[in-house]
Curated annotation (Swiss-Prot):
Record's keyword terms, sorted: Cytoplasm, Hydrolase
EC numbers, comma separated: 3.5.1.5
Xref: SUPFAM superfamilies: Urease, beta-subunit
Subcellular location: Cytoplasm
Chain's gene name: ureB
Family matches, as Gene3D superfamilies: Urease, beta subunit
Top-level taxon of the source organism: Bacteria
The protein's name: Urease subunit beta
GO biological process: urea catabolic process
Record organism: Opitutus terrae (strain DSM 11246 / JCM 15787 / PB90-1)
Subunit structure: Heterotrimer of UreA (gamma), UreB (beta) and UreC (alpha) subunits. Three heterotrimers associate to form the active enzyme.
Protein family according to the UniProt entry: Belongs to the urease beta subunit family.
Pathways involved: Nitrogen metabolism; urea degradation; CO(2) and NH(3) from urea (urease route): step 1/1
GO cellular component: urease complex
Listed PANTHER family: UREASE (PTHR33569:SF1)
Amino acid sequence: MIPGEIIPAAGLPLDANTGLETKVLTVANTGDRPIQVGSHYHFFETNEALEFDRDATRGFRLNIPAGTAVRFEAGDTKRVELVALAGAREVYGLNARVNGKL
């Protein structure tokens, strides 16, 4: 099995993140080292060397398959799609910018 892999029943469509708000933004790595962000990491709390509209990302994560990540090489700029966090919408730990309800 591949991390994040989903094996749906034969003939049934796979539907992920349906109905959740998404947004696309441009992210630049202003640092001198690569930064990798995992699929379920609260994007608002990513490394400070990543430059983007941080306030717009509160309550969002990368819209990529579970168990995968996006790597931002030093000096790179790329566009990413984010999806709203679901469930209880509570975030704890990470960089301690929320530590509670969104």
